[in-house]
Structures are given as structure tokens and as C-alpha cells.
Amino acid sequence: MSKADLIIGSQWGDEGKGKIVDMLCANYDYVCRSGGGHNAGHTIWVDGVRYAMHLVPSGILHENIINIIGNGVVVNPDVLIAEMAQFKNLKGRFFISEKAHLNLEHHSLIDQAKERAKGDKAIGTTGKGIGPAYADKVNRTGHRVGELLNPEKLCENLMKEFDENAKFYDALNIKIPEKIAVFNELKRFKEFLAPYIANTTEMLWKALDENKKVLVEGAQGSLLDIDHGTYPYVTSSNTVASGACTGLGLAPKDIGEVIGIVKAYTTRVGNGAFPSEANDEWGEKMCQIGKEFGTTTGRKRRCGWFDAVCVKYSARLSGIDKFALMKLDVLDGFEKVKICTAYKLNGEIIDYFPCNLESVEPVYEEMDGWDSIKGVKKFSDLPENAQKYIKRIEELTNMRAGFISTSPERDDTIIL
């Protein structure tokens, strides 16, 4: 019996998980998504071509791999259908859990209306309806992908719920759709998606029993976890390693190696605490060189120095075995680089991740920078200062480096 390996974002998302998943895919039979929705963007560069995916697992670029969207994902059928249209011959190699919840148009309208109402206190969601879809799931009023197989019944249930909540929608200035429009849309969803809806939990159990190799592609980052992240500025699902179990129907003993993905610096989209944020020329330089604009929203990402305290916390939460250091080349040419090694909280130096992260000040260690590393494929060929930087990150986070990315291209990666 085999185990499922995990790739987990260890910061606030956008770490570069897609590249590592794509690089490792050839060694696996299955690639799965276990949580999140189309708020998460996966970007892969192959032969200079950029592929941006939001729901479909990154393994879809390999025709011999079976790709699964698990029950923990909230699925927007419109987005999924448009994304699937980019790829050929999906039947038999792409499946959606019948238990995954639907993220429909009214969810995004609610999301956007609530964010507008909060004004300057807005969380900074993507406005894609992820939170409202998960809220319906927890409230036991949501609808699942399997219900698309009976669009007549699903339409009746949705219209009944719209009527029951008419005052709520009116207060948010959201117009309730006509029944015929809802039915026609659900019918279209069924016609396109029905061949791909399956009992993916049983499928994965059988795969592991048959010693197939399974890779789970995490969405977003550990610091956005609904329980362990910088609440309330978080996402609506569990993004740490344990979320893969509930999001796919796996047992803890089914989990094998856990690989954490970290950038050589730190980024964050939206509001919330960010101790090592660099609101200066260096942060702007990271943003421009690293092309730090969201795959999903196009929003400019906030940039800052590597935060070893945050990453050490993420590593412990997910039991990370080794990490992949991404975008090291973005720091090429920096005369000095910094690492946040601790925090100052109420005058005291701490080395742990507190609940009130917004109250801390960063404590930095400064190191000498390096010249270009772009395209380097051997650790020994890296400049000495770049090697020192990596080793210092290993020491501070209690993890070992397994991969070092030296450019966006798939092959420009040092494997240790």
C-alpha cells in the first residue's frame, strides 16, 4: 500500500507550488486538489509558455496522469468548464468529487456585496464567492457537485432558498435570478461535467491499495488556514497538511512525504498582518522583478523579506520533511538581504508565531547579497553568499532544502 505525498504552501500563498508540482508530476499516477476554489491560482511555465489554472490540478499538463478535484474544493462550474476547454482528451484522466460543494453566481455576488459594505475594514477577499460557498457548506444549506446530475431538483431547491432569503438578497441589492435562467444554466453544467463526476474517495483508496503514486497539490498557504492562519484575514478552508485528509477522504496514515514551498522572500495579497513587509524601494523591486501580481485577481502583492518565524511555524503545523525555495533569482543583485529571525512583542523578543501577529515588530539579520544565479542547476555552482542564505534558512526553520528554483522555467531547479 502506497502513501500520498503532499505539496503545501508555507507562507501566505503564491509561493510557486505549481512549478514544483509540474516538475514532480512525471513520478506520480494521480495529482489531486483537496481544498480551496478558483481563488487560488496555479502558474506553470513550460518552454516559455505560461499556464494559469485555478481549479484543475497542475498534473493536467501530463496526459498519463489522472487528476482529481476532491470533496474539500468548492467548484464554480463556469470557471471549471472554461478552464477544461484549454485541454484535450480529459475523459478518463480528470474527475471531480461528487461531494465537492458548488460555488454558484449568488455566492460571488454575496461575497462582493459584503466586502463593499465593510469599507476600509474589508478582509480583502478575491470576491470569488469562496467564503459564502463554504459558509453554506457549514450551515448545511449548500449544494454538491453530484446534484448537478438532477438539474430539475437542484433548480427547485435553489429557487426555494432564494425565496426564503429574499429579504437578505434585497438588503445586499442582489437580484434573484429567474427560474428558467437558473435551470438552463444547471442543465448546461450537467451536460458538460456529468462524465467527470465520480466517487473520488473510493478511487483514491483503490489507487493507494494498488501502490499507485499520489500527489496532493495544496492551495494557497498555511498562514491563510482558517484555524491556524492570521484570522480573520484568512481563507475559508484548512490549508495545512491535515486539510488534505478531510479534503480527499484520506486517513492520516495515508500521508507520506510533505514538501513545503517557500519563496526566498515573502508576499501577501489582501489585508492582514505582515511583519516583514518592505514598504520601500526593496519591496517594490521584489514586486517588479518577481512579477508579483495575482494569478486570479491581478492584484499587486505586498512584498517583504523572508520571515523565518512564520515558515518555522508552518513547518511544524504540517510536519514538513523538506522545502523548495522558490524565486531565489529575484534577489539577484541585491547588495544586502534580510531575514526576519524573531519578533519583538511588548518589548520582549520572541521566536514563535503569536495570535496577535499584527502587534509584533520584526527582528532582522542582514546578510551579503550575490550576483546572478539564473539557471544554475548545481548547489555548488551558486555564489557563496547565496549558499549561506539557504543554509541560514535551513537553520532557522528546522527544515532541509530539497529544491531551489533559479528561474521560472521547469528545468532551472537545483535538486538536493
Curated annotation (Swiss-Prot):
This is Adenylosuccinate synthetase. Its main location: cytoplasm. Keywords: Cytoplasm, GTP-binding, Ligase, Magnesium, Metal-binding, Nucleotide-binding, Purine biosynthesis. The keyword Methyltransferase does not apply. It comes from the Bacteria. Its EC number is 6.3.4.4. Homodimer. Its cofactor is Mg(2+). Gene3D superfamilies: Adenylosuccinate Synthetase, subunit A, domain 1, Adenylosuccinate Synthetase, subunit A, domain 2, Adenylosuccinate Synthetase, subunit A, domain 3. Coiled coil: none annotated. Pfam families: Adenylsucc_synt. Pathway: Purine metabolism; AMP biosynthesis via de novo pathway; AMP from IMP: step 1/2. It is found in: Cytoplasm. Substrate binds at residues 295-301. IMP binds at residues 14-17, 39-42, 126, 140, 220, 235, 299. GTP binds at residues 13-19, 41-43, 301, 327-329, 405-407. One of its GO terms (molecular function) is GTP binding. Mg(2+) binds at residues 14, 41. It catalyses: IMP + L-aspartate + GTP = N(6)-(1,2-dicarboxyethyl)-AMP + GDP + phosphate + 2 H(+). GO terms for cellular component: cytoplasm. Binds 1 Mg(2+) ion per subunit. The keyword GTP-binding applies. The active site is at 14 (proton acceptor), 42 (proton donor). It is an enzyme of class 6 (ligase). Plays an important role in the de novo pathway of purine nucleotide biosynthesis. Catalyzes the first committed step in the biosynthesis of AMP from IMP. The gene is purA.
